């Protein structure tokens, strides 16, 4: 009988699943070097092979989506470096690796070292943008760290001469390939910083294989570039070649020629800038001179205006003007006094009582005549309107209608009868004629029918 605190019991499926998850999650992706054997490629396009060394072997699978990126055909017995994930094939419990990438062993080991150093330096922060130094603009002196016999130096000097012939260049000759190259590059960077002769450095070489460029993947070179006080432009190989030095440098140029373009200014552009600056200076000078000339003219004119003789002349002119104004004012005043006297004389004559009485009598006579004429006209118009009104009243008077043979019948209460339905038998009616009134009693009421107008058919 099992104890109450017995360990967990796995099924085979659960055991294989647990082991697979442990391998995939704990091991992750690894680099493995070994010799290929038992290489097969079925119709599916996947690769199946074994990696082995002197004492052990492991089954491998590389699926079609991954192996199509491999640039060579794997051969039996070939040494390779693979990047793979470790897993377990659960149905059989077979431990195997799933290969993601494959390289020949020599180049593969270098690539592995490259990736490891890149990850290490990136973790330390040597690639961070906050440490990148700005390039001087413009550069007053350029230092070049490269081989004095290489094509890279020729390209750099050619571009600098074409763009900015006056820019000083200091060459720090060093090996760029071989075992001694990293140490020489480091010493050249340190020497340039010690002398402090230039304000920007170009570190680089021409293109080549991964082994040829390996000096610029050296950790010592990377740390020397990072420690440099002088900004460094890396120019290693071609545009597709990326080294550790490119990540650490303050700026990466795709080629040595491009690096020379970056640190120099175009001579034609400089000439255009100089011409533009000269034009601006000439315009500023012209404006300044014109402004000073205008100011001088204003001051000169002001001084002339303040001259004593000119002031005396102005005062003399003003005195003469005042005298003329006084004479003119006196003459005007005398003239206005004479005119006032004449006006008063005329008013006095006009105010004579005899003249006023005569004018008043004439005015009274005119008013009496106009009043009599107005009264006669109004009386005639009133008589005419009265006659017209009498004639109109006679024409519309009911008495005139009765005089022509008509009569008006009304009930005892005075209501005029218009229809027989207003009359009842036995009621008293009053009939008004042209020459008197007849009072009668209703003995019968007969209603006449209205005749319909007959229309003829067409």
Swiss-Prot record:
The lineage of its organism: Bacteria, Pseudomonadati, Pseudomonadota, Gammaproteobacteria, Enterobacterales. Its main location: cytoplasm. This is Exodeoxyribonuclease 7 large subunit. It is found in: Cytoplasm. The keyword Nuclease applies. Keywords: Cytoplasm, Exonuclease, Hydrolase, Nuclease. HAMAP family: Exonuc_7_L. One of its GO terms (molecular function) is nucleic acid binding. The keyword Cell membrane does not apply. Belongs to the XseA family. Bidirectionally degrades single-stranded DNA into large acid-insoluble oligonucleotides, which are then degraded further into small acid-soluble oligonucleotides. Pfam families: Exonuc_VII_L, tRNA_anti_2. It catalyses: Exonucleolytic cleavage in either 5'- to 3'- or 3'- to 5'-direction to yield nucleoside 5'-phosphates. One of its GO terms (biological process) is DNA catabolic process. Its EC number is 3.1.11.6. CDD domains: ExoVII_LU_OBF (cd04489). InterPro entries: Exonuc_VII_L, Exonuc_VII_lsu_C, OB-fold_nuc-bd_dom. The gene is xseA. Heterooligomer composed of large and small subunits. GO terms for cellular component: cytoplasm; exodeoxyribonuclease VII complex.
């Amino acid at each position: 009988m099992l104890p109450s605190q017995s360990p967990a019991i796995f099924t085979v499926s659960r055991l294989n699943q647990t082991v697979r998850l442990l391998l995939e999650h704990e091991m992750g992706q690894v680099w493995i070097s070994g010799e290929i054997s038992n290489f097969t490629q079925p119709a599916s396009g996947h690769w199946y092979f074994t990696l082995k060394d002197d004492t052990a072997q492991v089954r491998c699978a590389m699926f079609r989506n991954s192996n199509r990126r491999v640039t060579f055909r794997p051969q039996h017995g070939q040494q390779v470096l693979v990047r793979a994930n470790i897993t377990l094939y659960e149905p059989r419990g077979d431990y195997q690796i799933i290969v993601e990438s494959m390289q020949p062993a020599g180049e593969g080991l270098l690539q592995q070292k490259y990736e490891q150093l890149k990850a290490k330096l990136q973790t330390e922060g040597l690639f961070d943008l906050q440490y990148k130094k700005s390039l001087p603009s413009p550069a007053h002196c350029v230092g070049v760290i490269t081989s004095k016999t290489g094509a890279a130096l020729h390209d750099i000097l050619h571009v600098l001469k074409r763009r900015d012939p006056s820019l000083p260049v200091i060459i720090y000759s060093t090996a760029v390939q071989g075992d001694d190259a990293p140490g020489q590059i480091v010493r050249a960077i340190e020497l340039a910083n010690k002398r402090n002769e230039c304000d920007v450095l170009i570190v680089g070489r021409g293109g080549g294989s991964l082994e040829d460029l390996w000096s610029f993947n050296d950790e010592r070179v990377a740390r020397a570039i990072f420690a440099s006080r002088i900004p460094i432009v890396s120019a290693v190989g071609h545009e597709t070649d990326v080294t550790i030095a490119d990540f650490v440098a303050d700026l990466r140029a795709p080629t040595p020629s491009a690096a020379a373009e970056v640190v120099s200014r175009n001579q034609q552009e400089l000439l255009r800038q100089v011409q533009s600056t000269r034009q601006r200076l000439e315009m500023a000078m012209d404006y300044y001179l014109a402004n000073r000339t205008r100011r001088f003219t204003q001051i000169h004119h002001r001084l002339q205006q303040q001259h004593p003789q000119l002031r005396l002349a102005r005062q003399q002119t003003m005195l003469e003007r005042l005298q003329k104004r006084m004479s003119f004012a006196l003459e005007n005043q005398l003239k206005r006094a004479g005119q006032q006297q004449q006006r008063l004389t005329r008013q006095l004559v006009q105010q004579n009582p005899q003249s006023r009485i005569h004018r008043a009598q004439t005015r009274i006579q005119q008013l009496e005549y106009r009043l009599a004429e107005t009264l006669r006209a109004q009386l005639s118009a009133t008589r005419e309107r009265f006659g017209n009104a009498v004639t109109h009243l006679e024409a519309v008077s009911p008495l005139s209608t009765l005089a022509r043979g008509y009569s008006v019948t009304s009930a005892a209460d005075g209501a005029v009868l218009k229809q027989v339905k207003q009359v009842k038998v036995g009621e008293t009616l009053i009939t008004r004629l042209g020459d008197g009134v007849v009072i009668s009693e209703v003995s019968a009421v007969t209603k006449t029918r209205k005749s319909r107008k007959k229309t003829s058919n067409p």
